[in-house]
Amino acid sequence: MSMVYFNILMAFIVSFVGLLMYRSHLMSSLLCLEGMMLSLFVMMSVTILNNHFTLASMAPIILLVFAACEAALGLSLLVMVSNTYGTDYVQNLNLLQC
C-alpha cells in the first residue's frame, strides 16, 4: 500500500472515529460525514487515475452529487432542529420524545 492510499485511509478512519466520538452535536456529525465523503472521493479519483479505469470515471462525480445532497439535507435538518429546540443536539432528533 502506497503512502497516498495510507493517508487517505487514515483520513477516513479519523473522520469515522470522530463521528463515533462527537455524535452529541449535529454539526460535528455532519462535518465528520463530509470528511468521510471527501476521503472516499479522493480515494476513488486516485484509484481511477492510477488504474486507468475509463468506464468508472463518472463515479467520483456521482459521489459528489450524493455528498452535496447529504450536506443540503443535513443543514436543513440542523436549521429545523435549532429553530425548534434552540440547540443542535442529536438527541433532539428522536421522534419518540414528547
Curated annotation (Swiss-Prot):
Disulfide cross-links: none
UniProt keyword annotations, A-Z: Electron transport, Membrane, Mitochondrion, Mitochondrion inner membrane, NAD, Respiratory chain, Translocase, Transmembrane, Transmembrane helix, Transport, Ubiquinone
Catalytic activity: a ubiquinone + NADH + 5 H(+)(in) = a ubiquinol + NAD(+) + 4 H(+)(out)
Major site of localization recorded for this protein: mitochondrion
MF (Gene Ontology): NADH dehydrogenase (ubiquinone) activity
Keyword check for Membrane: yes
EC number: 7.1.1.2
A Pfam family annotated for this UniProt entry: Oxidored_q2
Residues spanning the membrane: 1-21, 29-49, 61-81
Topological category with respect to the lipid bilayer: Multi-pass membrane protein
Subcellular location: Mitochondrion inner membrane
Any Gene Ontology biological process: ATP synthesis coupled electron transport
GO cellular component: mitochondrial inner membrane; respiratory chain complex I
Function: Core subunit of the mitochondrial membrane respiratory chain NADH dehydrogenase (Complex I) which catalyzes electron transfer from NADH through the respiratory chain, using ubiquinone as an electron acceptor. Part of the enzyme membrane arm which is embedded in the lipid bilayer and involved in proton translocation.
Family recorded in the similarity comment: Belongs to the complex I subunit 4L family.
Subunit structure: Core subunit of respiratory chain NADH dehydrogenase (Complex I) which is composed of 45 different subunits.
PANTHER family according to UniProt: NADH-UBIQUINONE OXIDOREDUCTASE CHAIN 4L, NADH-UBIQUINONE OXIDOREDUCTASE SUBUNIT ND4L
Protein's UniProt name: NADH-ubiquinone oxidoreductase chain 4L
Gene coding for it: MT-ND4L
